[in-house]
C-alpha cells in the first residue's frame, strides 16, 4: 500500500475528496499524513521481524561508534549493557560514556518508510489511522467500529506472521526434553 492510498482511505472515511498528490494543501490530508506517520512509528517501535536487525559494529580509531541507521531503538544483543544514541554516536548508558574499545553486538529497531512496510502492517496502520481520525472528527459510530475492527484484523495478521518468523518451538523447552527422556510403562 502506498502512503497516498492510506491518506485517501482516511479522507474518504471523512467524506472528503481523494487527493492526487501527497503534498497537497488540503488540511485534512495533512492531518491524515501526520496521524499516519505517528501511528507508523508507534507500530514500528514495538519491533517486528521486518524492522529488527542484529549487527556487530566496530568503533572507529577515536573510539566512537557512529549510528547511521534511521533507528527507533538500540538494544544490546550480546550482554546486559544498555545503549542509547547521543549526538549520532552510540552511548553506553551503564558506563555513561560514548567511547568503545571493542566491537559491540546490537539489536536495532529500524524506522521504515510507509511504502517499505509489509502489506498487512501497512493496512493495519492505515485502518487504525482512519479509525482514529474518524473518531476525533466525527465521533464514534458504526463506521468507526468498522475501521477499528478492520485494523484489529490486520493487527492479528501481523502478529501471526511475526510469531511465524520468530520460529518459536516448544520442542526446545526443558519440559519437552523431560518428555523425550521419560520411559513410558505399558
Swiss-Prot record:
Protein localization: Virion
GO terms under cellular component: virion component
EC number: 3.2.1.28
Protein's GO biological process: adhesion receptor-mediated virion attachment to host cell; symbiont entry into host cell via disruption of host cell envelope; symbiont entry into host cell via disruption of host cell glycocalyx
Reactions catalysed according to its record: alpha,alpha-trehalose + H2O = alpha-D-glucose + beta-D-glucose
GO function terms (MF aspect): hydrolase activity, acting on glycosyl bonds
Family matches, as Pfam families: Tube
Keyword Cytoplasm assigned: no
Keyword annotations from UniProtKB, A to Z: Degradation of host capsule during virus entry, Degradation of host cell envelope components during virus entry, Glycosidase, Host-virus interaction, Hydrolase, Viral attachment to host adhesion receptor, Viral attachment to host cell, Virion, Virus entry into host cell
Cited function: Structural component of the tail, which functions as a receptor binding protein (RBP) and mediates the attachment to the host capsular exopolysaccharides. Displays a depolymerase activity that specifically degrades the polysaccharides of Klebsiella pneumoniae capsule, which allows the phage to reach the host cell membrane and bind the entry receptor. Hydrolyzes trehalose.
Protein name according to UniProt: Tail tubular protein A
Species annotation: Klebsiella phage KP34
Amino acid at each position: 500500500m502506498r502512503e497516498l492510498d492510506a491518506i485517501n482511505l482516511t479522507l474518504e472515511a471523512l467524506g472528503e475528496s481523494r487527493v492526487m498528490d501527497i503534498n497537497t494543501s488540503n488540511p485534512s490530508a495533512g492531518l491524515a499524513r501526520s496521524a499516519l506517520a505517528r501511528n507508523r512509528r508507534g507500530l514500528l517501535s514495538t519491533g517486528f521481524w521486518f524492522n529488527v536487525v542484529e549487527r556487530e559494529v566496530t568503533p572507529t580509531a577515536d573510539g566512537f561508534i557512529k549510528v547511521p541507521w534511521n533507528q527507533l531503538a538500540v538494544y544490546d544483543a550480546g550482554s546486559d549493557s544498555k545503549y542509547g544514541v547521543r549526538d549520532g554516536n552510540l552511548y553506553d548508558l551503564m558506563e555513561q560514556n560514548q567511547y568503545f574499545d571493542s566491537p559491540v553486538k546490537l539489536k536495532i529497531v529500524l524506522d521504515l518508510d510507509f511504502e517499505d512496510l509489509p502489506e498487512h502492517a501497512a493496512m493495519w496502520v492505515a485502518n487504525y489511522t482512519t479509525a482514529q481520525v474518524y473518531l476525533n472528527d466525527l465521533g464514534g459510530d458504526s463506521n468507526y467500529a468498522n475501521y477499528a475492527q478492520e485494523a484489529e484484523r490486520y493487527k492479528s495478521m501481523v502478529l501471526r506472521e511475526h510469531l511465524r518468523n520468530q520460529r518459536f518451538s516448544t520442542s526446545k523447552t526443558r519440559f519437552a526434553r523431560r518428555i523425550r527422556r521419560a520411559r513410558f510403562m505399558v
